[in-house]
């Protein structure tokens, strides 16, 4: 059995002296494990970096086997992100969330496209964080935990949506929130406009977006697996909080 198609490197782990056990995300094959022989060597290391887009080829004698995976580098997102600590933190968080939440060998085309879009623009200032929030929303939707941000759960209004119920995942209008505001999750405005430029979202709105998706990822996507949110995702949120509080070391 074998397949070949573009894929995103989600995770790599040492396996022996020079091989790597990898997880990639392919558009039609989903999250897929494989053994990259020589992946830790001089030629393989630049390819097998989390976040890179590759042309992957997986081969095994039987479908249930781990199999061997090889790849050709298409887009070096990991190397590009190295120039910006925040972009690198976003890349690592996105890959960790995808690797931990997506079931193995199950296609999730929307999540793949969103993640590929995030990684393709990882070097464009100001776009990575909003793209991560949009990716996580799509991931939740594809896993069956989608949020309803179309109208207010209380009034039915489609205007002035500002919050989300942490219980139902439905939007709530500012005027209808009343005394419930302290219990609701903030809904950043950039999520209400699919065509909004991601580089216009400020840092506080991005943190609100990550708090929103993080709540439902932890409760539903990872909660269903009895697993915590990945450390890389928790670290990113902490970095944003410290940066908003004026900590220059969190940049």
Swiss-Prot record:
UniProt entry tagged with the keyword DNA damage: yes
Chloroplast found in the keyword field: no
Keywords: DNA damage, DNA recombination, DNA repair
Gene Ontology biological process terms from the UniProt entry: DNA recombination; double-strand break repair
Similarity annotation: Belongs to the RecO family.
Origin species: Acidiphilium cryptum (strain JF-5)
Matching PANTHER family: DNA REPAIR PROTEIN RECO
One Pfam family from the record: RecO_C
Protein name: DNA repair protein RecO
Classification of source organism: Bacteria, Pseudomonadati, Pseudomonadota, Alphaproteobacteria, Acetobacterales
One GO cellular component term: bacterial nucleoid
Function: Involved in DNA repair and RecF pathway recombination.
HAMAP family hit by this protein: RecO
Domain of life of the native organism: Bacteria
């Amino acid at each position: 059995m074998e397949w070949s198609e573009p894929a995103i490197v989600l995770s790599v782990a040492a396996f022996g002296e020079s091989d790597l056990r990898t997880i990639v995300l392919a558009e039609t094959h989903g999250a897929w494990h494989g053994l990259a022989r020589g992946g830790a060597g001089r030629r393989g290391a630049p390819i097998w970096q989390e976040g890179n887009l590759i042309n992957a080829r997986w081969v095994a004698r039987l479908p249930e086997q781990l199999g061997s995976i090889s790849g050709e580098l298409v887009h070096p997102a990991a190397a590009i992100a190295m120039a910006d600590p925040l972009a690198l933190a976003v890349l690592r968080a996105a890959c960790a969330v995808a690797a931990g939440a997506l079931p193995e060998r199950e296609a999730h085309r929307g999540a793949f496209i969103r993640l590929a879009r995030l990684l393709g623009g990882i070097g464009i200032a100001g776009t990575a964080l909003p793209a991560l929030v949009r990716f996580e929303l799509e991931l939740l939707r594809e896993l069956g935990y989608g949020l309803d941000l179309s109208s207010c759960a209380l009034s039915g209004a489609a205007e002035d949506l500002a919050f989300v119920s942490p219980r139902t995942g439905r939007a709530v209008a500012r005027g209808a929130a009343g005394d419930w505001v302290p219990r609701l999750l903030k809904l950043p405005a950039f999520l209400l406009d699919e065509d909004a430029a991601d580089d216009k979202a400020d840092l506080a709105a991005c943190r609100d977006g990550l708090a929103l998706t993080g709540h439902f990822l932890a409760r539903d996507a990872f909660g269903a697996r009895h697993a915590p949110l990945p450390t890389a995702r928790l670290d990113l949120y902490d970095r944003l909080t410290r940066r908003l509080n004026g900590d220059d070391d969190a940049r």
